[in-house]
Amino acid sequence: MQYDSKLPIYLQVINSIKMDIINNRIACGQKLPSSRELAVQYTINPNTAARVYQELEREGVCFTKRGMGTFVTEDETIIRAIRSEMADEAIVVFLKRIKELGISVDEAVEFIRHKEEETDVSK
C-alpha cells in the first residue's frame, strides 16, 4: 500500500480495512490479523497497528475476545453505516471538484450515465 503524506497512516489503514469489509474481502465475524501481523502486512509500526485496532474498536467495527484475537463485527447495521459514510465522503469530494469545473449537478449526472455506458466499471 502506498501512503498519502497528507493523511495520517493509521487513518489510511483504517480506511483500507473498512473498504475490505464493505467489499466482503474481509467477512463479518472474521478474525483479523494480530497487531504484529497487521504491522507487517501494511509495513507500519506495531504501535500504529495497535492504534488502528483501538480506533476500529471504538467505532464498533471490530471487537476483541481476550486471548482469542480481534474480530470484525457481525452487526450489518454498522457495516451499512460504514458503506454510507464512505460513499458520502466520495460524493462530497466529487461534488466539490465538479463545482470547481463549473459543471452543474444535472450535467454531472449525465456525464456519469454516459461514462457508465461506455466503461465497464465492474472491474
What kind of feature is each model-predicted range?
Residues 1-31, 37, 85, 89, ...:
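Extreme N-terminal segment that seeds HTH/winged-HTH DNA-binding domains in transcriptional regulators
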Residues 9, 13, 21, 35, ...:
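Hydrophobic aliphatic residue packing
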Residues 10, 46, 59-61, 69-71, ...:
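A general secondary-structure boundary signal
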Residues 10, 34, 68-85:
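Short, cationic-aromatic polyanion-contact patches
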Residues 25-26, 30, 58-67, 71-74:
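Beta-hairpin "wing" of winged helix-turn-helix
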Residues 31-63:
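N-terminal helix-turn-helix
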Residues 40, 75-76, 117-118:
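Short Asp/Glu-rich motifs
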